[in-house]
Every structure is written in structure tokens, then in C-alpha cells.
């Protein structure tokens, strides 16, 4: 009897250790891989990735500051910095588009460390997620663009572009895209306030929390700029204009502006291998930062207003996404369900 009793503390100790180890596992992660050569094999984290018959040598980085003439997009595996929770992942294209592109999880888990954004057939068979949206030249979901009075345009020309992993903890991570010396294409309708001799500096930080599919987006400018905008694209991108599409939502709520879209399209140009995906996108802009609603052929947009804080001009908003056909248990399977979900989601945002 005494021997059995003495085993209990040992068993309980092992159980406690297992619980502790599980509780320490990260629930968010970041991914930022630069393409290299075999000569980079001594770098920390170096990996050899196989894409069909192609072999790619990569190593992780945390920041890249680049001249705008440099082809950063093609020098990065998955084309930019990325962040993920168990439910969703997002990447930021590192070029003039700076577009947000979503990756949906079929199984709630962290997986970019294994799939590197492009899961092979074996991983797909194990229930891994995948890219779900063809963004083309659109705003995607929650990218920051400029409204020239007729359509959205990319953030250019600039003196410098950068992307980086700002911070990462077990339950939260922040990634950033930034520019320096942006020569804003001002018009009479979008005047620029403040000194602009050296252009405008702007950073956009995207923060993801564990257990969330949404992100908070914080915009910081060296001077106020009228004409900044964000929003959601049409699905497909060459679909009906927002005003003619019943699967669009533009709604003024008591606490801000809610923009959303719903639709079905191929996620990539390879329609032979990939099936169409039904996707819901949304952006919520709190009332102090929500300006006029505008749209062009492929994007439903809201102009951003900013507040001056600590000699900087700041604004924030939120974005979210659902992969209705990709997820095992999606939060919505129809446009009506998606819009209802979003109204509940937006109520708690400020």
C-alpha cells in the first residue's frame, strides 16, 4: 500500500509538468523568410524547402529595410512578413502594394513553420490550411491605400520601405510595414497638412491575438494625410461594383463604420489544381477615425481620419476574414450569416 501511495506525487508531478509545458506553447507565431543560397547554410534557422521539383534555400529574418527599387517581393519566401493564430494567418506583400492576403486554417493550429504558406499535398492531406484569396491589385482586406479622388492607388513613390516583426509573445504578435519619404499625390480634394519637404513617413502595425481571426491595425504618420483609405475587395476582384453587388455591406454603426464582402473565386491562377473558395472579408473603422465612404470597380473603401498624439498622426481599425469552404467549422457559411456575425463582432470594438 505504501508503495502505491508514494507513486501518486510522482504521477501528479508528471501531470503538472505536462500541463505546464502545454500552457507554455505559443498560440501565435510570425514568419519572415528571405531566399538565399546554399552558402547561407550556416545562418541560424536555415532551411531547404521543396516546391515540387524546385529547391529553395531560405533563412529567417526579423526586419528588412530596402530601397524601393529593390525587388523585395521576389526575394522573400511568401513575399512578405506573416503572422498567424490558430484560426487564421495573414501576410503583407513587401512591395508598392503592401496588400494584406489571408491564409485560412482547416484545423485550428499553428502551421506556417511546417507549410511555409505553401502546404504540399502531404500536409493538405493532414488537414493543413492554405491561401484562400486572389487579391490581384486590390485592397485585399484591411490594406492601407490612398484615394486619389477616383480610385485607390498604392503607397508610392517612397524613399524607403521596410517590414519587420515588432514583437511576439505566447498570446500576441505584431508585424509592421512602413515607408519613409512618401511623396503623397495630393489634389485639391485631398490636401496634405504639415511640412512635406522630405515626404511623409508612415507605419502600419498589425496585431494578432491568440484564438482570434481578426487583427487590430494601427496607422502612424509623421504628418496628417487626407486621402488614406482602407476597406475590402470584391470577390472575385473583377466582380460587380460595390453598388451593384448584394454581397457587399456598407453600414454605419453607432460606434463606427463596417465594410464587408462575400464571394467565391479561385484563390490562385492555377484553377486546375485548386478549387474555388468562398470567402468573407470585413473591416471595422471606429467612429473617431471613419471618414467618407468611397468605392472603385473592385474595392469598397472608407477614408481614414487621424488624431494627433505625441506629435504623430494616428488612427486604428480592425480587419477579419472567414474561409467558408476551407474551415472545418466556419463562423459563417452564407453572406447573411457573415454580416450578422460581423455586427456582433463590431459591437465590442472601439
Please annotate each region the language model reported.
Residues 22-23:
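C-terminal motif of bacterial Sec signal peptides marking the signal peptidase cleavage site
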Residues 1-8:
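N-terminal secretory signal peptides that target proteins for export/translocation
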Residues 164-171, 210-212, 221-227, 308-314:
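A short, structured loop/turn motif at beta-sheet edges
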Residues 202-248:
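Acidic (Asp/Glu-rich), glycine- and aromatic
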Residues 63-64, 70, 277-350:
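Beta-strand-rich recognition/accessory modules
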Residues 125, 129-211:
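Extended, loop-rich substrate-binding clefts of extracytoplasmic carbohydrate-active enzymes
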Residues 27-156:
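Solvent-exposed N-terminal domain segments of exported/luminal and surface proteins
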Residues 229-290:
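Polysaccharide-binding surfaces and accessory modules of carbohydrate-active proteins
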Amino acid at each position: 500500500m505504501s508503495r502505491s501511495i508514494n507513486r501518486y506525487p510522482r504521477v501528479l508531478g508528471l501531470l503538472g509538468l505536462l500541463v505546464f509545458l502545454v500552457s507554455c506553447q505559443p498560440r501565435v507565431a510570425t514568419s519572415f523568410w528571405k531566399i538565399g543560397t546554399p552558402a547561407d547554410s550556416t545562418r541560424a534557422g536555415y532551411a531547404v524547402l521543396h516546391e515540387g521539383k524546385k529547391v529553395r534555400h531560405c533563412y529567417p529574418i526579423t526586419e528588412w529595410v530596402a530601397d524601393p527599387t529593390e525587388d523585395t517581393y521576389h526575394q522573400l519566401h511568401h513575399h512578405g512578413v506573416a503572422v498567424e493564430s490558430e484560426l487564421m494567418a495573414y501576410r503583407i506583400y513587401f512591395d508598392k502594394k503592401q496588400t494584406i492576403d489571408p491564409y485560412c486554417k482547416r484545423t485550428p493550429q499553428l502551421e506556417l513553420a511546417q507549410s511555409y504558406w505553401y502546404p504540399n499535398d502531404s500536409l493538405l492531406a493532414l488537414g493543413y490550411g492554405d491561401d484562400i484569396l486572389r487579391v490581384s491589385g486590390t485592397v485585399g482586406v484591411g490594406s492601407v491605400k490612398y484615394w486619389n479622388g477616383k480610385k485607390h492607388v498604392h503607397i508610392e513613390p517612397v524613399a524607403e520601405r521596410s517590414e519587420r516583426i515588432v514583437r511576439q509573445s505566447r498570446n500576441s504578435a505584431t508585424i509592421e510595414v512602413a515607408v519613409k519619404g512618401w511623396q503623397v499625390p495630393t489634389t485639391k480634394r485631398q490636401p496634405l497638412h504639415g511640412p512635406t519637404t522630405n515626404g511623409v513617413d508612415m507605419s502600419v502595425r498589425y496585431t494578432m491575438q491568440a484564438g482570434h481571426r481578426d487583427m487590430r491595425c494601427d496607422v502612424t504618420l509623421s504628418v496628417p494625410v487626407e486621402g488614406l483609405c482602407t476597406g475590402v475587395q470584391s470577390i472575385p476582384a473583377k466582380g460587380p461594383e460595390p453598388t451593384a453587388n448584394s454581397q457587399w455591406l456598407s453600414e454605419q454603426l453607432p460606434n463606427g463604420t463596417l465594410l464587408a464582402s462575400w464571394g467565391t473565386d479561385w484563390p490562385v491562377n492555377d484553377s486546375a489544381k485548386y478549387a474555388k473558395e468562398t470567402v468573407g472579408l470585413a473591416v471595422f473603422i471606429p467612429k473617431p477615425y471613419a471618414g467618407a465612404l468611397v468605392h472603385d470597380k473592385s474595392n469598397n473603401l472608407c477614408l481614414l481620419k487621424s488624431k494627433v498624439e505625441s506629435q504623430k498622426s494616428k488612427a486604428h481599425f480592425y480587419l477579419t476574414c472567414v474561409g467558408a469552404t476551407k474551415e472545418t467549422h466556419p463562423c459563417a457559411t452564407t453572406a447573411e450569416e457573415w454580416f450578422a456575425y460581423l455586427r456582433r463582432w463590431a459591437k465590442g470594438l472601439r
